[in-house]
């Protein structure tokens, strides 16, 4: 019913379902305009059993309003928030590619290993998007205090052209935009969340940097060291597991990269990178300090 309403009132033609997450469903669609104008977009709606719950609706609207002003090459763009007969949807940039979960699964099926430099490159592009979001201010110049809170394989896209995009700010927190229940509920995916999230504490931008470190380690090792049999076990590992010497897990990982990972994954936020810009600098220095390094074209060629 929701899709029928959207198609008829807003000139979208739904092509196929792309992704189904915990709270939302994303479809590929065509937006039609005058004189046979057609633009391929993505349409996100709330899952039906959440669509009547005020908290989910408020967060959905808050996500759209927040991301509408995040204009950055490493963040999926939002074009429009629509509503008809109580049904809300977000029209977004369509990425011709895969998320990291799909990407690494395809590599495993083909028995291919992601080159170390590309793992670091992908992570550096995530950091570029986060650095921009973390520094975002309102129109009066006041910091919004954005924290994504759900940096994970499912929420990082790789376009076949080689662009890396952060998506799904659905549980992000930001001043004045989204419902914030920190200290009451656990937000984020259990095997990527920071110790602060796992322990029901208040988060800041350094929480996203821990999750980014988990992503980098996962890309390098081909597995998530914190993933347990249950979400509860994953949270226990994040809170208590000794962070390994990554050099012993993969011979490609040298001391500088091992040190970088340990700084990202420090349980004490004060021992982590203070900003995404700092982490970005170290990531890019690692892959470019000796000269030429990976580019979007390099990643796109590898992905295709």
What are the roles of these predicted feature ranges?
Residues 81:
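Activation-segment/catalytic-loop signature of the eukaryotic protein kinase fold
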Residues 47-69:
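AlphaC helix of the eukaryotic protein kinase fold
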Residues 128-146:
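Protein kinase catalytic-loop region centered on the HRD/HxD motif
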Residues 85-99, 103:
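Conserved short submotifs of the Hanks-type protein kinase catalytic core
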Residues 15-22, 26:
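Protein kinase glycine-rich loop
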Residues 157, 191-301:
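C-terminal lobe helix-coil module of Hanks-type protein kinase domains
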